[in-house]
Amino acid sequence: MRPSKRAADEMRAISFERGVSKHAEGSCLVKFGDTHVLCTASLEEKVPGWMRNTGKGWVTAEYGMLPRSTGERMRREAAAGKQGGRTQEIQRFIGRSLRAVVDMQALGEMQITVDCDVIQADGGTRTAAITGGWVALHECLRWMEARQMVRVEKVLKDHVAAISCGIYEGVPVLDLDYAEDSVAETDSNFVMTGKGGIVEIQGTAEGVPFSEEEFGALMKLARSGIDRLVSLQKMAVA
């Protein structure tokens, strides 16, 4: 039995709230159960120096956790003077995932930065950030389209969403919360597009290796979860 009493293939309650920042061109507060992430998409009408005069744009991401997003207060990374390795790895993961569905040529020489700030963490912050980050990115492109800068459907080629899966007490389960994630035998993150393309898979065995059969079960769970997330994204931006 899962601590949350959910079925093995049952996700937490998922919600997207758009337009939560009056300053950002695009914003979304995404909730995966008790994991809450504020995603804002900000437009700059320039690109990094290494992309100048290419005619292409760029999408990047930054990630952070508020000090009391966890059970005990975390020290701000700014106070430490540098980002931790985990933060850098996660924000690169988010950026790669979002870029997988963006036509940089159609975007033109502009950069969109998607900031993902964890307000409350209960497992799956990176998957929530990718899924909510797509909604914020869509809202930013919609803002640009209203000003005749781009066409959303030309720039954004597809949906992208992410979900965690793992093996908890010998059973493959979908969308792990912290109570499960902290003791799971296997922990994986799956990123897929709306058309079913695989963007990235991160999978780790905690002590005991997992079998190809178990991986197949996790993949099946992930695909069903991402199908559901994409449906919710579509409703959120309709």
Swiss-Prot record:
- Documented EC number(s): 2.7.7.56
Where on the tree of life does the source sit, at the highest rank? Bacteria
Q: Which Pfam families match?
A: RNase_PH, RNase_PH_C
Q: Where does phosphate bind?
A: R86, G124, T125, R126
Gene3D superfamilies, A to Z: GHMP Kinase, N-terminal domain
One example GO MF annotation = 3'-5'-RNA exonuclease activity
Q: Keywords in UniProt for this one?
A: Nucleotidyltransferase, RNA-binding, rRNA processing, Transferase, tRNA processing, tRNA-binding
Instruction: Check the record and name the InterPro entries matching this protein.
Output: ExoRNase_PH_dom1, ExoRNase_PH_dom2, ExoRNase_PH_dom2_sf, PNPase/RNase_PH_dom_sf, Ribosomal_Su5_D2-typ_SF, RNase_PH, RNase_PH_bac-type, RNase_PH_CS
Going by the record, the broad EC class of this enzyme is transferase
- List this protein's GO terms for biological process: rRNA catabolic process; rRNA processing; tRNA processing
Subunit text: Homohexameric ring arranged as a trimer of dimers.
Purpose of the protein: Phosphorolytic 3'-5' exoribonuclease that plays an important role in tRNA 3'-end maturation. Removes nucleotide residues following the 3'-CCA terminus of tRNAs; can also add nucleotides to the ends of RNA molecules by using nucleoside diphosphates as substrates, but this may not be physiologically important. Probably plays a role in initiation of 16S rRNA degradation (leading to ribosome degradation) during starvation.
Q: Which HAMAP family match?
A: RNase_PH
Spell out the protein name for this chain: Ribonuclease PH
Biological source species? Brucella suis biovar 1 (strain 1330)
